């Protein structure tokens, strides 16, 4: 018996695998696959087929049936009406045909959705319908059908065993079954509107086919690409294969332009780059702008600078019109891909309201205002409706919700809305909408790019993907972070090794010695880097500067603008002309390295109008620098010193104190990881041109999980005069974020002049600052029933009320026990609320704390100018109020 040689078998197999497949239909039929086709009221294309479109044009499970302007689809032997097909996002809105009528007449069963084809959209959920239930029992959200008996609907299966059967239905996530008796009309209405699913068929093979002028199709479940041969005119098809991993990485690393925007990449995309962006972020470049449509709402890119924090979008329909016709209120899913910045708020607009003028005028707060649209009364609310700041106005909000026909929520800039609150008018409202809102970086993409990959999207899993040379990864390419951090050190070691090896007389000695030295050097470096590795991951989105660049931007450190306990601050200028502050840390022993990591890792996680913005950092050996935004007005202590020529009134000081409180509230509650500052004082509060405060200097900060109410510290940190008592003696309680609250209270007292009283009345040499609250409480006791008296002392009643409020808030904040102090979100509420709502806090048991000699490891400083000299007018205000 003879056998075919192995080489022939291999050749035969390859020819069989790659030989073009004959197309089953004619060239004319192939034309139907190329064009979109109309089915009912829908226009569809690949991967659908049906009607005049042949079966090989689409996936075998996606046949559309067209009858009397109705489009339907059969899934697992169940018919679904197709209300809408979005070819751009590959989404369908479906409804079970049997659920379009009476619910009790529907087929009570659950069709199986092929997971390789369909995925339920995240704005919908599945609810379980339990039927043939025990009529003797009581069920939540129940109803009795005439022929099927009692049924109940629930998201849980608490009482499934008492019902004989069950099936599932898809409803919007906002749908909540009634607690007791089911409102059948409510349920039927939700089911008739249908639900959305996303096709998870891989689009990349078809995109590759289209780019080569081929036509996409299917041979069973295998995607194929078909072309008309030039010689015979016949149709040939070949299986489509996805581009290589390195090819995808190369393509997605290339940036693109759209309209007036340049250098765009993930999550945005344009035709031909579908695998390089999120499906919801397809850009339309036709109008001279870069616009995207998410959930039927158009957004325009105003600025998309990946190298800075300036990434702004705005709703297109509100750019030139406060009252656009029929604005949509579908909440966009932007935050699933790009998070809003911390200072973004949801501006809520109410249209066509049938309210009596007495119901809303005058408004109870600056959070509310009138739009002034021509058709009906219209109003706006400048805060997210779920904000605790609006808890006192729920009655007004309920009136607006019930009496207004339309409500629209629009993301907007928090600072712009603050301006609107201060000066409410249509121009400021228009500016707030036209300014747009800021977005944060996509953290997954930042990690991917740093690791050498390119950002993309997996259509099958509907998840982010990082394209790497060796294949796609979930988040980042497989690299050793030690190699990135220490490559300069490695290069130096290798250079020294090579240089020494050239000395012939020491070759034998070096062969024996260098391996040991190399192991020792690498082990020391690795140990040091391992301690920094976790926190360095937080630095990925930041700009890394070399020491030469730092020296160049500061003109060789020419202008000093500030000095601190850990370094000197210089004025600098970036290449784009922006002024920056460059803090160069001292090359000192002790906690210098940890101070640098604390400051950079803490600031890199923040984005808030009252937190100084970190722009980059430098770390070369022992040389470390931090680059952040420059604020011309400098620090707060310059404005509350008696040496200053600029006198701030109480209204300005109140605005600064409120801004600092909001910044601390953000650090404690607004970040993914809670940040405790531990060094709140006037020197660390910077002021911009509008005297808006920004908390700075995070050298002593500590990160902890929000669920942690107690922190473990091995050292004392802070500045004398602002340190919470529990930081020095644990007899007062445990260290927590409430330590910042105490420091804030001391800051408030210094701002309004209360600290000056201590300066005059205290002559002891021990320097303790624990005595100063006692005279405040003594003066409070002199007042009738603990109330503060209204005394005319040459200031306005508004300023007097501000001083009273700040004094009471300060007293609450400096309670000796941390548990008696309010959290910062409560402090903000107290500062924004009315004076009448504030009570005089109970007098704590105050003890003098003697600050003994400090250990070398303690991070505690005593600024010679930290206890500011405050002008006499503010001192007089506080003394009179408390007398």
Swiss-Prot record:
Glycosylation is annotated at 41, 69, 74, 183, 219, 227, 303, 356, 384, 444, 460
Which family is it part of? Belongs to the protein kinase superfamily. Ser/Thr protein kinase family.
Catalytic residues (UniProt): 679 (proton acceptor)
Q: Which residues lie on this side of the membrane: Extracellular?
A: 27-491
Q: Where is the Protein kinase domain?
A: 555-846
Keywords, A to Z?
Answer: ATP-binding, Glycoprotein, Kinase, Membrane, Nucleotide-binding, Phosphoprotein, Receptor, Serine/threonine-protein kinase, Signal, Transferase, Transmembrane, Transmembrane helix
User: Upper taxonomic classification of the species?
Assistant: Eukaryota, Viridiplantae, Streptophyta, Embryophyta, Tracheophyta
Q: Membrane-spanning regions, if any? A: 492-512
SUPFAM superfamilies in the record, alphabetically? Protein kinase-like (PK-like) (SSF56112)
Annotated membrane topology is: Single-pass type I membrane protein
- GO cellular component assignments: membrane
Positions on the Cytoplasmic side per record topology: 513-883
Places the protein is found:
Membrane
- What's the protein here called? LEAF RUST 10 DISEASE-RESISTANCE LOCUS RECEPTOR-LIKE PROTEIN KINASE-like 2.7
Identify residues that carry Phosphotyrosine: 628
Residues that hold ATP according to the record: 561-569, 583
Predominant location of this chain?
Answer: membrane
Q: What is an example of a GO molecular function annotated in this UniProt entry?
A: protein serine/threonine kinase activity
Q: Where is the signal peptide?
A: 1-26
Residues with PTM Phosphothreonine: 546, 716, 719
EC assignment: the record states: 2.7.11.1
At the top level of its lineage, which domain of life is listed?
A: Eukaryota
* Catalytic activity reported: L-seryl-[protein] + ATP = O-phospho-L-seryl-[protein] + ADP + H(+); L-threonyl-[protein] + ATP = O-phospho-L-threonyl-[protein] + ADP + H(+)
């Amino acid at each position: 018996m003879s056998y075919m040689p192995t080489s022939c078998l291999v050749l035969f197999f390859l020819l069989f695998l790659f030989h073009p497949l004959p197309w089953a239909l004619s060239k004319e039929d192939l034309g139907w696959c190329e064009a979109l086709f109309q089915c009912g009221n829908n226009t569809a294309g690949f991967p659908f087929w049906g009607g005049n479109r042949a079966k090989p044009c689409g996936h075998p499970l996606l046949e559309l049936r067209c009858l009397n302007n109705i489009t339907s689809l059969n899934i697992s032997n169940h018919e679904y009406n197709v209300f809408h097909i979005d070819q751009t996002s590959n989404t369908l809105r479906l409804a079970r045909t049997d659920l379009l009528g009476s619910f009790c007449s529907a087929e009570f069963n659950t069709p199986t959705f092929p997971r390789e084809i369909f995925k339920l959209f995240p704005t919908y959920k599945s609810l379980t319908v339990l039927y043939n239930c025990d009529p003797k029992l009581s069920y939540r959200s129940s109803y009795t059908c005439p022929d099927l008996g009692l049924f109940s609907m629930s998201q849980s299966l608490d009482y499934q065993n008492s019902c004989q059967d069950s099936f599932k239905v898809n409803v919007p996530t906002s749908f909540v079954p009634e607690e007791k008796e089911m409102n059948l009309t409510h349920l039927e209405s939700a089911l008739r509107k249908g639900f959305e699913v996303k096709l998870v068929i891989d689009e990349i093979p078809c995109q590759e086919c289209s780019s080569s002028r081929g036509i996409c199709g299917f041979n069973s479940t295998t995607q194929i690409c078909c072309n008309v041969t030039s010689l015979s005119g016949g149709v040939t098809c070949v299986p489509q294969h996805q581009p290589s991993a390195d090819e995808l990485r190369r393509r997605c690393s290339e940036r693109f332009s759209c309209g007036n925007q340049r250098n765009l990449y993930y999550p945005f995309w344009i035709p031909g780059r579908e695998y390089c962006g999120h499906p919801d972020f397809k850009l339309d470049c036709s109008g001279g702008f870069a616009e995207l449509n998410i959930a039927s709402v158009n957004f325009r890119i105003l600025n998309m600078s990946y190298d800075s924090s300036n990434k702004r979008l705005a709703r297109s329909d509100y750019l030139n019109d406060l009252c656009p016709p029929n604005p949509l209120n579908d909440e966009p899913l932007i935050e699933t891909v790009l998070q809003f910045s911390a200072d973004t708020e949801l501006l809520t607009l109410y249209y066509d309201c049938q309210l009596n003028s007495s119901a809303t005028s005058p408004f109870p707060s600056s959070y509310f205002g009138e739009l002034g649209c021509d058709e009906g009364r219209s109003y706006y609310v400048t805060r997210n409706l779920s904000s605790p700041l609006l808890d006192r106005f729920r009655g007004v909000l309920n009136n607006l919700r019930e009496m207004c026909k339309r409500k629209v929520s629009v993301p907007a800039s928090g600072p712009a809305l603050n301006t609107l609150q201060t000066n409410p008018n249509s121009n400021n409202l228009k500016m707030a909408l036209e300014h747009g809102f800021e977005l944060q970086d996509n953290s997954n993409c930042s990690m991917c790019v740093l690791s050498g990959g390119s950002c993309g999207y997996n259509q099958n899993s509907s998840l982010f993907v990082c394209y790497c040379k060796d294949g796609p990864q979930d988040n980042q390419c497989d690299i050793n972070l030690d190699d990135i951090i220490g490559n300069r050190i490695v290069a130096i070691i290798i250079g020294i090794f090579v240089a020494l090896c050239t000395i012939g007389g020491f070759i034998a000695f070096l062969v024996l010695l260098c391996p040991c030295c190399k192991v020792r050097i690498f082990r020391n470096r690795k140990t040091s880097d391992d301690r920094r590795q976790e926190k360095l991951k937080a630095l990925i989105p930041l700009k890394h500067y070399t020491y030469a660049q730092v020296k160049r931007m500061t003109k060789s450190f020419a202008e000093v603008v500030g000095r601190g306990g850990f370094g000197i601050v210089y004025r600098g200028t970036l290449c784009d002309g922006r002024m920056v502050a460059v803090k160069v840390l001292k090359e000192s022993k002790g906690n210098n390295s940890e101070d640098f990591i604390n400051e950079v890792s803490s600031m890199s996680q923040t984005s808030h109008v009252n937190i100084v913005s970190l722009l980059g950092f430098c770390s070369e050996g022992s040389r470390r620098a931090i680059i952040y935004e420059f604020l011309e007005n400098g620090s707060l202590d310059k404005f509350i010193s008696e040496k200053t020529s600029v006198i701030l009134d109480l209204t300005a000081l109140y605005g600064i104190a409120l801004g600092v409180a909001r910044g601390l509230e953000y650090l404690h509650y607004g970040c993914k990881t809670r940040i405790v500052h531990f060094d709140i004082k006037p020197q660390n509060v910077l002021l911009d041109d509008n005297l808006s405060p920004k908390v700075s200097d995070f050298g002593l900060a500590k990160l902890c999980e929000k669920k942690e109410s107690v922190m473990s510290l091995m050292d004392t940190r802070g500045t004398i005069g602002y340190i919470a008592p529990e930081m020095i003696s644990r007899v007062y309680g445990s260290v927590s974020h409430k330590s910042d609250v105490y420091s804030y209270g001391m800051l408030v007292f210094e701002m309004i002049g209360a600290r000056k009283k201590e300066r005059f009345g205290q002559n002891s040499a021990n320097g303790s600052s624990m005595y100063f609250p006692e005279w405040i409480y003594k003066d409070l006791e002199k007042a009738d029933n603990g109330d503060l008296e209204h005394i005319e002392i040459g200031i306005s009643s508004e300023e007097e009320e501000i001083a009273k409020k700040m004094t009471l808030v300060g007293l609450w904040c400096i309670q000796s026990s941390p548990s008696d102090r309010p959290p910062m979100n409560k402090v903000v509420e107290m500062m924004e609320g009315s004076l009448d709502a504030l009570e005089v806090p109970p007098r704590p048991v105050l003890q003098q704390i003697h600050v003994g000699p400090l250990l070398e490891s303690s991070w505690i400083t005593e600024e010679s100018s930290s206890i500011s000299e405050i002008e006499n007018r503010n001192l007089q205000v506080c003394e009179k109020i408390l007398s």
